[in-house]
Each structure stands twice: as C-alpha cells, then as structure tokens.
C-alpha cells in the first residue's frame, strides 16, 4: 500500500509560508497526497481539519540551539530552545521529534546521537 504525505509544510503563519490550511489541503490533494504535516516556525498548529480522505497532522518547527526540530502530532506551544529539552518537550506532548534539515551545512544534526 502506497501512502503519500509531505511531513514538512509551512502555512501563512510562518515567514516562509504563504497558504492557508484550505489552500494547503487543496494543493496537496491536487498532487496526489493523502496528508500533510503543518509545522510552522515556533508556532503549534491549533486549527483542526476534519476530512475522511485526508490527514492533517498538527506540528511545530522549533528553532533550537542545534538546528530546526519538527514536533509532529504536537498541538501545544513549546518554548524550549536547547535541543535535548525541545525533544523531551515534544515527547511529553505525545509527539514525534524529527530533525527538520539533517543535511544542512549549518546544522549540527549529522553529529547528534539518536534519541
């Protein structure tokens, strides 16, 4: 079974995002995706989307001392900026922590231990 998702989307609530949730869902559907994770910069997604054929995963992209961290399935605001504390905070919210840009030259993510 093939499932197609984009797990790193920014909405109009991020400096580098332009689209509303409705526009994101419409665009993703047009490209054959079954869902997306909306992870705005340092702002948890609190809006909900109810559609039986599309999954909108709430998230946040945290700016930490060692690069950007995605918190998937997070609906609460997280203020931690030290990477370990941010990962722990994501987990405490029941979320999944993923480095946003692990191969970016300015990131230390390649040298990090797995959590």
Stretch-by-stretch model annotation:
Residues 1-96, 100, 107-113:
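A metal-dependent hydrolase metal-coordination microenvironment
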């Amino acid at each position: 079974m093939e499932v197609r998702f984009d797990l790193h989307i920014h909405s109009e609530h991020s400096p580098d995002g332009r689209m509303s949730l409705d526009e994101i869902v419409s665009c993703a559907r047009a490209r054959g995706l079954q869902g997306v994770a909306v992870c705005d910069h340092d702002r948890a997604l609190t809006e909900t989307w109810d559609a039986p054929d599309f999954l909108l995963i709430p998230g946040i992209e945290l700016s930490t001392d060692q690069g950007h961290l995605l918190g998937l399935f997070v609906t609460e605001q997280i203020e931690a900026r030290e990477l370990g504390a941010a990962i722990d905070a994501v987990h405490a919210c029941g979320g999944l922590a993923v480095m946003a840009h692990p191969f970016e030259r300015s990131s230390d993510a390649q040298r990090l231990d797995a959590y």
